[in-house]
Amino acid sequence: MEEVPRRQPGGLVEVEGVFQFYEDWECWDYVSQRVPGERLQRWLAMLTNNQLRRQVIREAQIWMWKHKGAAVRRNCGCRLCNPGWGSQVRNVEL
């Protein structure tokens, strides 16, 4: 008998995941450049735990909705450019 074709990547579930990934990334990119430093450090510390990622994105979306016209405070919101809480635990190799 012939084997049933396996499901190929790129079906509906994966596409939704890809769109969700880009929505989350755009939200983080926008908000991480505009939030106050304390909040950014808290979120960066929370992002070290994979279980808290959705909570961080949700809080970032709420912050973005409440502060629509917030000014840009920094060029980048990454941990490397903004060392702080929990940054000493990791060694970043570039």
From Swiss-Prot:
Q: Between which residues do disulfide bridges form?
A: none
Name under which the protein is recorded: Probable Vpr-like protein
What is the role of the protein in this entry?
Seems to function as a Vpr-like protein, since it mediates host cell cycle arrest in G2 phase. Cell cycle arrest creates a favorable environment for maximizing viral expression and production.
Record-linked InterPro entries: Lentiviral_Vpr-like
Which Pfam family would be a valid example here? Lentiviral_Tat
Q: Which gene encodes it?
A: tat
| Cellular compartments annotated | Virion; Host nucleus
Keywords (alphabetical) are: Cell cycle, Host nucleus, Virion
Q: State a GO cellular component annotated for this protein.
A: host cell nucleus
